[in-house]
């Protein structure tokens, strides 16, 4: 309704009864009255508009929030690479886990909330469109860490599927602040993980985590987040962990693949028994065989390239890690180069698979934080209770070069002309720099519930045995799955809105 509009039924008749001059005066008076009423309404509603703006964009709630910025410095010089800097890798674990008898109370779970509240009346249509674009396309991987007093969405006691070595609170870690830091991209918000939204987006689909023990770390984080709204059914076996959510027919799976490429132990050339051989140009056949069963795959690898292995390319031995018996022959490929080749191999093979059209997410190198030495030379992350402050990121030459080779291998695969539109289903989840700040998120010496474990440095300053590679749960690793959910949302909703879909 237009403000101060005259009632047509009476006013129109009245005007026609007056002479022309009188009717003109009447119109003038009516227009003046309309202007006064409209101006009064604007003055009256201004405070209300301010209140609405304050409600949606309140600033006092962020006054006490601490921000730790992730600062990208392209001029950083990586330190020399040494295989001794590589972190330890746990032995391949068995997948035949028994279904935990966990209980959950939905009243204690803080899930991401969706609201039907309208936007402030001060936001124009163009501004709304700009905000939607930013929310959909913004860079998730450059931003800052901020302290969130709400804390995590689960506890070590509310998730029965937790590898004990990552159960930091259960293992006696005295501080808990590391659980409260959340990631904030520079251009948008990364929503809290919403388990119900995830299960609805993935309805009838399967998400698989494929990789080493750090991939298991991420998979267990995903399970802990989902377990808060529904207890799944264990449908796994020794070859593959599988958890089924009845309400939405969603399956979460995990496959162990140390290197993501074909491996074998039989003698090859001058490489005898007792050492693992890797065909860098052949994908792990178990992954390829299982691919048609998956709709989304989260890949990760790299840390096993610190272990002893032989590298084979084009059916020729070209290098090795901690192995090269014939010093008279030159090595063509080291473990860093081998890692990059393996990434390109598996990404191309998945993208070209005739029976796999799913979304592939490659999570980049997960940084370790062995400070003062390597994992086997006195490196430590003991006593770290919050993220590194802005600008204080400690460079690690091995981390930087491994991340570079991984990203290069991915982009080479994506650039393959033979992939066509299938390259759009390949996503790089680049977490390395952001998580370089999270030296506080590792178990450190709190790797077991043993009350007699050593957690302090000895008289000679020697640190206790510790894990500065994997992540506490709950902890920073949960952010990875917030990113996974956002990538899935963008892909699925983008397909629904695409005319060609």
Swiss-Prot record:
It is a single-pass type II membrane protein. Induction: By dark. Keywords: Membrane, Signal-anchor, Transmembrane, Transmembrane helix. The keyword Transmembrane helix applies. GO terms for biological process: leaf senescence. Contains 2 motifs that are conserved in esterases, but it is unlikely that this protein belongs to the catalytically active pectin esterases. This is Protein YLS7.
